[in-house]
């Protein structure tokens, strides 16, 4: 859709004068820069002979009182505008005023001491004529019009294509280029911000007010004899005639008339004030609250037998001159002593109350919703359950014991074990260790009943023997003692046979010499890091025969066949050697119960105090 505008109709003197006044007020609004020595005036304004092309691209909304659409404007005409002003040519004066604004800010010049230079304060104004012509505009804008909110114009793009700026300083090329750039930027800001705001204010001032001012004046004058005096009417009409009013009137005449009638109807001393439709007045608020549906009123309405109580309650409230009536349910309805025939049964009343509350709940909520009204439930003649003690242990909890504890042999409580161990040293020492081992037990506590759970013993696991005795009827105490004794015997035998073995070890070179093992001992370094050669050096085989190297045993290898031979020898010859040694020693450095064998230049110590079996137990396993 396009329009053809009669552009020649704009060349009228009233429109030209109105446009000049509008542009002058817009250009001089706000604070003027310090470079201007005089206000800006419109010297010449000419719309030209070429009309712009105005095209409506889209109409979004169209009604009697509102319009919204998208348009396109294209102008390449002969419009020109000439502005006249005076600029300040004294740079010292401009710098002086700019520095005052920057340093003093909001302080008055009387409170701030400034130097008074004569030359810098002198005015040197030069007249300036600025002509704008050859304007080319091409843009797309949105127009929104409402009868109550006015006209709004917004451009989607930058509509200014080009403009020609000519002034009295065209001979100075630097000033001409500066003015060209500055004016182009200002005109772009004009189309983007200033022009939409200006058009909106003008539409509110001249469209809405001009269309309704005559109608408002006529209707207000007709009500002069009824609701207003002549002075009040004159003052109100003067208010509408005042063009300098800061608050533009944007209400319609019908709304103003209704509001005026409502306001004037309350300016009276009459007791019977006129009612308003669909309005609750403060003077009639008590009647509204009494007639408002609540739980008590609904309960009275559903039960015909309770209506006389409802009437008595209202009369009692009027007699007491109470402004607020209680909407709660009287306790007499639920517990009554004078009229037991009607009010003795509370079940029916409670069901009615529940149904009323449920209907009120589902009235303002979705019936299909899963949420149900929450009710307070009171159970009568219900005893509270006895709380169980937190320390109570249930029998079922005892079944969660680890199976490894159940399979291991238990140690009887308060069992005393005396052990005597001997270190392999030149001066043997005796150590007596007496330990009391008590088996932990779980004491069952009462759970409120007379029967008590059977006690179960949980014992710490002990190392198992290599072979179990055939007789299973041996008592637990005897088995535990034998296991413990056999373990000590096997441990000592293992240490003894390692010492007597042919494999090279640190017993011969370190322990026999009284030297310790470790990096910090002065007697020697086991790893052979010292330079004197006293430490043990780990020898490596240099034989070229590969298969012999493969069959060569490590230094930590233990020959079990030799160990068995030694065991048999000790078993067969132990008594004889012990007797001979006992006679030769004289009882000084020999302890009874030990056997010494000094064959092959090695000393061996064997426990004979314990009657161990004929077959020696194997070494204890490493964990």
UniProtKB/Swiss-Prot annotation:
<dbReference type="GO" id="GO:0032865">
    <property type="term" value="C:ERMES complex"/>
</dbReference>
<comment type="subunit">
    <text>Component of the ER-mitochondria encounter structure (ERMES) or MDM complex, composed of MMM1, MDM10, MDM12 and MDM34.</text>
</comment>
<keyword id="KW-1134">Transmembrane beta strand</keyword>
<dbReference type="InterPro" id="IPR031468">
    <property type="entry name" value="SMP_LBD"/>
</dbReference>
<dbReference type="GO" id="GO:0000002">
    <property type="term" value="P:mitochondrial genome maintenance"/>
</dbReference>
<dbReference type="GO" id="GO:0007005">
    <property type="term" value="P:mitochondrion organization"/>
</dbReference>
<protein>
    <recommendedName>
        <fullName>Mitochondrial distribution and morphology protein 34</fullName>
    </recommendedName>
</protein>
<feature type="region of interest" description="Disordered">
    <location>
        <begin position="364"/>
        <end position="391"/>
    </location>
</feature>
<comment type="function">
    <text>Component of the ERMES/MDM complex, which serves as a molecular tether to connect the endoplasmic reticulum (ER) and mitochondria. Components of this complex are involved in the control of mitochondrial shape and protein biogenesis, and function in nonvesicular lipid trafficking between the ER and mitochondria. MDM34 is required for the interaction of the ER-resident membrane protein MMM1 and the outer mitochondrial membrane-resident beta-barrel protein MDM10.</text>
</comment>
<keyword id="KW-0496">Mitochondrion</keyword>
<keyword id="KW-0446">Lipid-binding</keyword>
<feature type="compositionally biased region" description="Polar residues">
    <location>
        <begin position="577"/>
        <end position="587"/>
    </location>
</feature>
<keyword id="KW-0445">Lipid transport</keyword>
<dbReference type="GO" id="GO:1990456">
    <property type="term" value="P:mitochondrion-endoplasmic reticulum membrane tethering"/>
</dbReference>
<keyword id="KW-0813">Transport</keyword>
<dbReference type="InterPro" id="IPR027536">
    <property type="entry name" value="Mdm34"/>
</dbReference>
<feature type="region of interest" description="Disordered">
    <location>
        <begin position="572"/>
        <end position="598"/>
    </location>
</feature>
<dbReference type="GO" id="GO:0008289">
    <property type="term" value="F:lipid binding"/>
</dbReference>
<keyword id="KW-0812">Transmembrane</keyword>
<dbReference type="GO" id="GO:0015914">
    <property type="term" value="P:phospholipid transport"/>
</dbReference>
<keyword id="KW-1000">Mitochondrion outer membrane</keyword>
<feature type="domain" description="SMP-LTD">
    <location>
        <begin position="1"/>
        <end position="204"/>
    </location>
</feature>
<keyword id="KW-0472">Membrane</keyword>
<comment type="similarity">
    <text>Belongs to the MDM34 family.</text>
</comment>
<feature type="compositionally biased region" description="Basic residues">
    <location>
        <begin position="372"/>
        <end position="385"/>
    </location>
</feature>
